[in-house]
Amino acid sequence: MAEVDFGDTELFEQLDGDLPASSVHVRFDSEGEANDVQELVSQHEETINRLSAENQELKRRLSLLNRPSGLPVEDKLDGPLLQILFMNHIISKQYHQEIEEFITSLFQKYEEHRKSNSEKTSFNIKPQPSSILLEENDDSDADTMKNIKQAFSVVGSVQYFKNFCLDKLGQPLLNENPQLTEGWDIPKYQQVFTQIVSLDGQEIQVKAKRPKPCCFNCGSEEHQMRDCPKPRDQAHINMKRKEFLDACGEAGNQNQQRYHAEEVEERFGKYKPGVISEELQEALGIMDKNLPPFIYRMRELGYPPGWLKEAELENSGLSLYDGKERLDASDGEIEDRDTEAKKHVSYDVSKLVNYPGFNISAPPDMFDEWQMFGSIPMQQAHQKDIFANYLTDSFPPGSSNKSNKRSSCQSSSSERKRQKTSGNHTVTSAVMDMDMESDEDMYHSRASKGYMFHPPLPPGSPSYGTPPPLPRGTPPSTPPNFIPPPPPTPTPPPLPKGTPPPTPNRDSPKVPPQVLDEDTWTLEELEEKQRLLWAQLDNGESTNSDCDAHTPITVSSVTSSPSRTELDIATGRKAAPRQTAHELKSPCVITKLFVAEPEEGGPLIPEEGGPLIPEEGGPLIPEEGGPLIPEEGGPLIPEEDSETNEDSNECYVVEGNDIEVNKLSSKHENASEKNPSDEDATEEAACVEPSPKRSGVPDVSKFAEGITPFEYDNMSDSTGVYLRLRGLLKNSPRNVQKSKKQV
């Protein structure tokens, strides 16, 4: 074996500088070994020469594709558009200039398109994985290398022949979407098999697919039956429709599954409340000696309401009805409509869950880190036995809340009766709201200072700020600003028969009627007032229906004013009295008086040939020779004489506070004589002949002299609708028949 010398001796010899350097590295001991080595060296030299020639050829070819050195590129659009390798072909040689001009026209076309559509987004062309990067090994920064890679990536290499083309790299995708790229149409092939081939001895259950909708006439899936161009075959359509419905039913039955409570319990049976498993400890990242983080939060929020719902006792849910009342099947007691919504709730304390560290004591080796979590220590009120006693005492199984509900209803109803509508109820409600707000503020202030135990309330329970209901029999509370109503005005006793009424003096001051506010009336007074008004209406209807044709009218007025002492005075209108021609020769005074309601006695019925004198409690009408004495509060008619024409047929109608003069001409006399049927349509009144000592009725200008007008702003102006309606009712066939029967 030849001894190999690494040249270390020559190195040291050169360092010493004494001996000349020799270039002998390999030494051969025998001639045979030298010949073999020389043959190997010659072979390697041939291989090296061949590889060197190939390397030179590759460098020459690469120089055609490689990017020019030192060319700066700022963007990928600054790179080359394409690189053409012109082959030795007659077409490439002949149309070399046309190809270059076409490429130049493409540049111009792109620039024009970009200027016209500046807002349009350009395609994001990414090089495909098969692309080749034309790059030289140079020292450039990262941004420059990124632009070079994008600009000098060969994304396509196609060799075009006369009859075909050969694509070596494939076409890139536009925006990574094959639909936007030409040449990426994937052909659809027919399905060769329909079922999966199973192994030997195995059965594969293939799920039935839902049939696709198709035309029942021809079986095509491209159109519906109504658009089928072929003639309809009804028998074939019915058969295909039946097959489609059967297939849909089979596919639907496979998906129908029922879930039962037992299956759910078996599925989640390993999860138990209050028990921390090893998997949960690992998921929470806690050790065996650490309390779960939710325990500290439960100390602030209380017992979980979901598990409290699980401990709630359920009743049968059946209700018995007897037509009037409902019987609860749980306890057999009668339940009102008001208490139907509020059902009785009770709890089974044996179903309360044990939570170590919350309602039961934690093991002694566990750490209570409530300060680290910003919580509170374990509360004594959260103990399981204390909470169970609270549920048992507050929600016993056989108790009911009907008494509290009824007492609260009674107190609320009585309070509504006593409250005023003028504003006291607003004060009362405001005071109650202030009380409730103060209670809530106290609750929040206490909770902020220190933690207080508030056990969760069952559904339907009142909030903390709601005041408790009053016990049964408690009188309603009086509002603070309540003003008691004044006592009712006593009614003066009726005057005996023959007693002349007091004549008011013209100089005496007039006492205005006392007007009370309707807001001071209580509910009992309003009901009494309503009852009296209905009685007056019934009296008035019966009086109007029973009156004779020659009987003066007595109307019961219905008070529309809020005052209890006011009388509703109807406005007068012109009336044609029912008289003979002889009686109309002298002037007469027709007086129409309206009273509130005669307390004693009936309607005014005059005697034959006598004056109109009412019974007790009615208005007074003067006799012959006496002055006109009005009702109390009515107008004063002076006794002064006035110059009147005795031969003229004049009739003065006096109605309440209004005085009208009706001049009845001879035409009216003829009309009253010729048309007796029209007499019923007029107002019935009595004409009283004046005293022979008097020359006539005073002039119109002197009427209402010295009378204080009664003004009431809230009283609406009279339109006469009531009188017209009453006239229509009196002319009805029913009233006409009654009047004929009475005559």
UniProtKB/Swiss-Prot annotation:
Annotated Pro residues bias: 455-504
Biased composition (Low complexity): 399-413, 551-564, 601-637
Keyword terms, alphabetized: Coiled coil, Metal-binding, Nucleus, Zinc, Zinc-finger
Compositional bias annotation for Acidic residues: 638-649
Cross-referenced Pfam families: PSP (PF04046), zf-CCHC (PF00098)
GO biological process, one term: mRNA 3'-end processing
Chain ranges of zinc fingers (CCHC-type): 213-230
Function: Scaffolding subunit of the trimeric nuclear exosome targeting (NEXT) complex that is involved in the surveillance and turnover of aberrant transcripts and non-coding RNAs. NEXT functions as an RNA exosome cofactor that directs a subset of non-coding short-lived RNAs for exosomal degradation. May be involved in pre-mRNA splicing. It is required for 3'-end maturation of telomerase RNA component (TERC), TERC 3'-end targeting to the nuclear RNA exosome, and for telomerase function.
Name used for this protein in its record: Zinc finger CCHC domain-containing protein 8
Protein source organism: Xenopus laevis
